[in-house]
């Protein structure tokens, strides 16, 4: 990839996480569970939200889309409001991308590790919706 393409990709990811952070700042503390997800996901089965009652984050297993070894993804995660707000990739972003582009699942892992956020992975088998179904 050219340096320009790499810079643009990193910039777009930073914009994404800035948008997520700003939207989560709008949520009040009245909710037991806050969900952050892509709006174009399709789920084969019902999401087991009743299993998401702990104090950590519940991350969607990304290996279904990205391949083995990439269990952490940014497509879907949920947890108590406090934990969802704590999960802020912007806190590690600049150092993480200092040497160039890396895969998003590594950013998720680094954020969880650096911020010491308890978490588990949910096997939701979700996939992005066929664009022709979106109106």
Name each model feature, range by range.
Residues 1-135:
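ER/Golgi luminal nucleotide-sugar-dependent glycosyltransferases, focusing on the catalytic module
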């Amino acid at each position: 990839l050219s340096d320009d393409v790499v810079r643009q990709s990193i910039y777009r990811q930073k914009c994404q996480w800035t948008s997520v952070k700003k939207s989560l700042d709008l949520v009040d503390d009245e909710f037991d569970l806050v969900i952050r997800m892509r709006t174009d996901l399709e789920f084969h089965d019902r999401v087991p939200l009743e299993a998401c009652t702990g104090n950590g984050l519940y991350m969607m297993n990304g290996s279904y889309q990205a391949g083995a070894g990439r269990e952490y993804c940014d497509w879907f995660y949920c947890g108590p409001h406090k934990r969802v707000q704590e999960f802020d990739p912007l806190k590690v972003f600049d150092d993480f991308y200092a040497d160039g582009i890396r895969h998003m699942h590594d950013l998720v892992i680094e954020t969880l590790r650096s911020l010491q956020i308890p978490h588990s992975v949910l096997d939701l088998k979700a996939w992005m919706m066929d664009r022709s179904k979106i109106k």
